[in-house]
Amino acid sequence: MNLCAGPFDRTLERCEENEGNELLQPDLNRMNNLRRVAVIDCGTNTFNLRVVDVGASAGWIPVFGQRIPVRLGQGGVAKGVIRPDRMARGLDALVAMREALRNYRVEEVHVLATSAMRDAKNGHEFVAQAKGLAGFDIQIISGQHEARLIQEGILLNFQEPPAETCLTMDIGGGSVEFVVWDRDGIKWAQSFDTGVARLQMLMGLPDPVGQEGVAKMRPYFDDVMAPLAAAMEALKPTLLVGASGSFDTIADLVGTRIRTERPDHAQSPEPHPSIDPVPLTDWEEVARQLIECDVHHRTAMPGMDPARVDLMPFSAGLIQWVLDQGTVTRMCRAPYALREGVLSRLERGLPLLPEL
């Protein structure tokens, strides 16, 4: 457990912007058996921060959130390095998050890093500099741990586990995590180095990618993700559950995203948001535009996230390959993922990482 330390000793100071309201909250938390925790997910594309108050039986109360695009893997993820400019960008993001956390009395800070950092030859250098500059102890997690934490997060978006067999898919910049599961638990899980930033660098495709570009990706997917194809053939998942950034954008593009995420500064625990349906017929039209249209057209698409506009054609290619395996009949987007999986474990008093 990474306790708040070093530069965070100053979180007890009054912040002029917040007039101390959030600073006083932990005193109330102690009376209510709550504790304030922060989780930072250092992804290949984006660093995400969530601050919540958690309790053994009370669920969690959202306090603060921050999302900073960093493109940590840009220009280096396929070579196994973090470029100096990307390292500086990532460190700046962590320092900014440290400054944001000075507004709150955070009792625990957990910082997890995924594909770009676990594959980079100089990942240890980033970890050391993050400790010196921001006071964070970064824990680099395996792809298997990442997949299981994502799964624990998305389960919170289901009021009841579905009766059918499901396939969770989390598209990251460096890797893509898959979990086949049903109401009895996880049947199969694996992480593949087919993230969209990695694909963009490896494939060298023009803009627009076009159907020719998708055809070029398919043999690579057939080779690298052969274990997934075998698992899908054997286990026959029918519901594709998409998590994280690419699927957030897809739900916005399709227009089905239900914005029920709980606001910051809520006063009490509220129900977790539910999944958003993504009709396959609507997805097919969105996918066509992502693949066949250039960056200017994609940028103008209602719901497009500008930070992902160059990567979404590769997300579309990945999803289309999964659908082409022939078992999936429905698709949805889950609002939660890795960070919420970590929070779920903290709330239940479990070790940060699940057993494999």
Predicted feature descriptions by range:
Residues 34-37, 51, 75-106, 116-165, ...:
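Helical "lid/coupling" subdomains associated with nucleotide-phosphate turnover
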Residues 167-175, 179:
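A generic, well-ordered mixed alpha/beta core segment in the N-terminal half of proteins
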Residues 35-61:
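N-terminal basic/disordered segments at the start of proteins
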Residues 57-71, 75-76:
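Conserved ATP-binding subdomain of kinase catalytic cores across diverse folds
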Residues 14, 23-26:
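Cationic, low-complexity basic patches in intrinsically disordered or flexible, solvent-exposed regions
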